[in-house]
Amino acid sequence: MNEISTIVDGDRMTSLQIAEITGKAHKDIMRAIRNMEPAWEKVQERKFALMQEEIEISNGGHKMRPYYSLNKEECLYIATKFNDEARAKLIKRWKE
């Protein structure tokens, strides 16, 4: 999963990176973000940045994989859903 860190620059973090850092499944991170987005949008008047990347699948074909690209504020908002250890890992990553 080393390619994940190259998706965005240091000012943003992807849902893929969040999954890797916290040890959670990416689909669970995506679900948490989708569930929290309506409240965020109501207060901040903007949605999270939903992106896609093309990935190769086992049969040699390709498919598009969705992911979110979040700034620090958005990322820390999402982290409120995590357990203490996962949240601490995410905060540590932002300090690096």
Language-model-derived ranges and their functions:
Residues 1-96:
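An anion-engaging/catalytic patch
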